[in-house]
């Protein structure tokens, strides 16, 4: 039996906050509550992405984070890569693992995509004050 949309939403919201942090998620949800346009995409992201994919136990969150970094590099989605770099740290990825995922993605996605990804990840790591992790 498939879970209801409300169940997916609640599970997705919990997963989303765990990975990305409440300080990132809450303002986006609040904006969505005030604006029909952004509300629709916030609901879709929370239900289907986070409630569907991220709550499945087949892959752990650390593995999913590493996959997301590679996929976002390939797609050139650097804004999302920044938030998922911070999420990867929360999910137990080391700076060394993040570096290797981006290096591996660069081989297949090309140097320009890799340069953008490394630059964006560096910005995210700087915001997380990761000197103690290096």
Walk through the language-model features, giving the residues of each:
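Acidic, glycine/proline-rich low-complexity segments that act as flexible tails and inter-domain linkers
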Residues: 1-62, 90, 116-134
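Short, charged low-complexity intrinsically disordered segments located at boundaries
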Residues: 43-45, 76, 98-103, 132-134
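Short alpha-helical scaffolding segments that buttress acidic/His motifs in well-ordered protein cores
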Residues: 45-49, 66-73, 101-106
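Mid-chain, well-packed structural core segment of small domains
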Residues: 66-69, 73-99
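Short amphipathic alpha-helical surface patches that mediate protein-protein
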Residues: 86, 103-107, 122
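A glycine-rich phosphate/pyrophosphate-binding beta-strand-loop-alpha-helix module
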Residues: 96-100, 116-119
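Substrate/cofactor-recognition hotspot
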Residues: 111-115
């Amino acid at each position: 039996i498939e879970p209801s949309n409300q169940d997916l939403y609640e599970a997705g919201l919990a997963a989303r906050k765990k990975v990305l942090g409440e300080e990132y998620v809450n303002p986006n949800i609040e904006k969505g509550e005030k604006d029909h346009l952004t509300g629709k995409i916030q609901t879709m992201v929370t239900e289907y992405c986070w409630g569907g994919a991220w709550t499945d136990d087949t892959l752990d969150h650390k593995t999913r984070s590493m996959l997301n970094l590679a996929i976002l590099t390939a797609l050139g989605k650097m804004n999302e890569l920044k938030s998922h770099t911070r999420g990867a740290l929360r999910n137990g990825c080391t700076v060394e693992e993040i570096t290797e995922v981006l290096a591996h993605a660069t081989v297949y996605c090309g140097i320009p995509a890799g340069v953008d990804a490394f630059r964006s990840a560096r910005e995210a790591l700087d915001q997380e004050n990761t000197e103690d992790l290096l």
